[in-house]
């Protein structure tokens, strides 16, 4: 049986006492004090002033004797005292100035980083478990991402709310804690992206011959990463730009401005890191299809300028290859991800065509092909979404 007199056990017992006092305060306000008030006695004020001194003095002593008190216990204690403090509005104003509880948060200042670390650790653990239990979630008739992206988003949003739940009275310190929370959310978002990225296997992107193939799992992984990036970055930016509800001193305003700049940098960096992971997968796709597209373009350019409908079919193998790969991706990917792939595929095809034009073998049809590039690039700049397929086909069939 554990020793009840250890500092740990005393802290846990005191936390339970505070929670009991909170419940009793609410019961006194609702049921007991009205009875006393009918007799002209303000029972709640007397009771509140007594527990005010007891809580602050005892809480400080219990926390000071521990070098590293349990984070869960201290956080639950802090929340309970915070709720008790809010009840001061139920006592006369002249008594509120006497409250030692007004600065109770100072007792817990050294514990805040522990709370953030614990919340971050729990968020990462929940994210990992969500990935282990992944199931497919239908977004539209074709587009999908997995349950871990939905659950992961919820876990990240819960972590993000920690700085608001603290309601830390000292604004300068509150801004610092908010930065720590934003940093933790970004780290957990990157943890999710890295976990789903590392679970992507070669067979999810390539067949046994090493050729690219668009699979459901590839689409889901890309959609998951994009979903986390879009939702979390949006909420984080809104969170970082929130204004303090209280009037700030000039010094606090300067700290708030600096804090927003720091948080903006952290969020932007996290977004770029997620984009880098996405780009890494897309790069693998483009590298795999590059040899096939190069061969198909070389076959087109080596032909003379088409003059009959039979010769015009020389473009069809390239059109068919691009369409077969883009069709599946276009149907199953979120639009921003598909746009990234389409853009890179177009740039790679355009670069390949330019290289072929510069070769000796392409001299016979260089004028016609140069016109193709110029017209294609012009059209692509006007509309990125699908011009690659349309322009190549229409140019050679003109």
In which residue ranges do the predicted regions lie?
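Extended alpha-helical scaffold/tether regions of large eukaryotic proteins
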Residues: 1-398
């Amino acid at each position: 049986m554990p020793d009840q007199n250890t500092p740990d056990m005393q802290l846990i017992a005191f936390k339970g006492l505070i929670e009991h006092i909170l419940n009793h305060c609410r019961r006194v306000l609702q049921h007991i004090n009205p009875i006393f008030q009918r007799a002209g006695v303000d029972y709640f004020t007397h009771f509140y002033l007594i527990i005010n001194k007891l809580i602050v003095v005892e809480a400080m002593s219990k926390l000071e004797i521990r070098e590293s008190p349990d984070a869960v216990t201290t956080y639950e204690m802090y929340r309970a005292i915070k709720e008790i403090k809010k009840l001061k509005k139920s006592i006369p104003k002249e008594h509120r100035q006497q409250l030692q509880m007004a600065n109770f948060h100072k007792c817990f200042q050294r514990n805040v980083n522990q709370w953030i670390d614990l919340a971050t650790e729990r968020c990462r653990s929940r994210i990992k478990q969500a990935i282990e239990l992944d199931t497919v979630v239908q977004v539209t008739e074709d587009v999908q991402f997995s349950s871990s992206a939905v659950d992961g988003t919820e876990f990240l949003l819960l972590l993000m709310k920690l700085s608001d739940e603290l309601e830390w009275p000292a604004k300068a310190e509150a801004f610092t804690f908010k930065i720590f929370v934003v940093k933790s959310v970004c780290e957990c978002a990157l943890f999710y992206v890295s976990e789903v990225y590392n679970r992507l296997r070669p067979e999810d992107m390539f067949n046994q011959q090493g050729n690219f193939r668009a699979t459901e799992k590839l689409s889901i992984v890309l959609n998951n990463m994009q979903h986390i990036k879009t939702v979390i970055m949006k909420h984080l930016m809104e969170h970082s730009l929130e204004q303090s509800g209280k009037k700030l001193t000039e010094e606090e305003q300067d700290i708030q401005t600096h804090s927003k700049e720091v948080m903006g940098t952290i969020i932007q960096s996290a977004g770029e890191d997620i984009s880098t992971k996405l780009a890494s997968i897309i790069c693998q796709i483009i590298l795999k299809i590059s040899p096939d597209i190069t061969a198909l373009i070389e076959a087109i350019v080596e032909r003379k300028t088409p003059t009959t409908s039979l010769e015009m079919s020389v473009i069809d193998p390239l059109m068919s290859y691009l369409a077969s790969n883009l069709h599946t991706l276009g149907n199953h990917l979120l639009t921003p991800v598909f746009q990234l792939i389409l853009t890179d595929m177009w740039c790679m095809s355009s670069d390949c065509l330019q290289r072929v034009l510069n070769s000796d073998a392409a001299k016979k049809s260089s004028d016609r092909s140069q016109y193709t590039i110029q017209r294609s690039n012009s059209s692509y700049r006007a509309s990125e979404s699908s011009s690659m397929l349309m322009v190549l086909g229409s140019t050679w069939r003109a």
